[in-house]
Amino acid sequence: MGNSTDSIITDYLVRVIARDGSIRALACVTTGLVGELCRRHGTWPTASAALGRAVTGGALMGALLKTGQRVALRFEGNGPLKNILVEADANGAVRGCVGNPEANPLREDGKLDVAAAIGQAGLLTVTKDLGLKEPYTGTVLLYTSEIAEDLAYYLTDSEQVPSAVGLGVFVEPDGAVAAAGGFLIQSLPPHNDEAVDRLMERIGAMPPVTELLRQGKSPEGLLEYLFEGIPYDTLEKRALAFVCSCSRERIERVLISLGRDDLASLLAEQGETEVTCEFCREHYHFGRDDLERLLAGISAM
């Protein structure tokens, strides 16, 4: 069983559809799981905002999948953050990490500059494990490096589904994550241009997502705000949580995959090793007896 948090109690996602079937939308609050991830990774404020936006986007995209399917997002730019990697599944489990947790560029007004942290030049790669022989992979250039717009651009350009995404993370001066969440809206055939125009007007006029979340807006509240005047039905409410699938057994398999010669060299030169999971920062220590046991297992194959 991987590492997880009690954010399952407070973090959740709601999925709705317009009554005429032309628009689907999801909204979520992720304050607990984002706070836990940032604490584990020791992220500075701008890195926290970037990681929080990305894992929230991952949770929203994971909710579009079927049971057993997974999605991975990789943002890679030329900024000091280096990269963000997020994995999410259809059951509400999400995890993520950043290349440089201490990246902390600020704008001239003192606000967190996520785009500068990621860098203006780079790629967003989306990999979906749909249970087929090969995973589906799509790649687009970063659009604004603000994450929400990049995901909307990917969905619209690569998957050919007109989409709007809003993401927000509010980080307190002391580095604590006070609010995190977002929404994803997609236009479906038969497209209702009037309803889409109304939604885009609402999105254009709405305050920042972080402001609405700090006012106490729930996922239901975000959707009510966006869908004003558009009848819709709620399809699902699901819990979201930070869950890491790492385990000592998995790390053992990684060490075994090094092969007999490399594992023997590790045993002879160091006598022990420690492996840290990049997603949850859990440490796994393997002493001499552990390495000898793994080496004996390889020899017996």
UniProtKB/Swiss-Prot annotation:
Q: Which UniProt keywords apply?
A: Chaperone, Cytoplasm, Disulfide bond, Redox-active center, Zinc
For whether the record's keyword set contains Metal-binding, the answer is no
PTM comment: Under oxidizing conditions two disulfide bonds are formed involving the reactive cysteines. Under reducing conditions zinc is bound to the reactive cysteines and the protein is inactive.
GO biological process terms held by the UniProt record = protein refolding
What are the record's GO terms for cellular component?
A: cytoplasm
Classification via InterPro entries:
Heat_shock_Hsp33 (IPR000397), Heat_shock_Hsp33_C (IPR016154), Heat_shock_Hsp33_N (IPR016153)
Q: Where in the cell is it found?
A: Cytoplasm
List where the protein spans the membrane. Answer: none
On whether ATP-binding is a keyword of this UniProt record, the answer is no
Its main subcellular localisation, reduced to a broad class, is cytoplasm
* Stored Gene3D superfamilies: Hsp33 domain (3.55.30.10), HSP33 redox switch-like (3.90.1280.10)
Show the GO MF annotations: protein folding chaperone; unfolded protein binding
- Assigned protein family: Belongs to the HSP33 family.
What PANTHER family does UniProt report for this protein, alphabetically?
33 KDA CHAPERONIN
State what this protein does.
Answer: Redox regulated molecular chaperone. Protects both thermally unfolding and oxidatively damaged proteins from irreversible aggregation. Plays an important role in the bacterial defense system toward oxidative stress.
Name of the protein described by the UniProt record: 33 kDa chaperonin
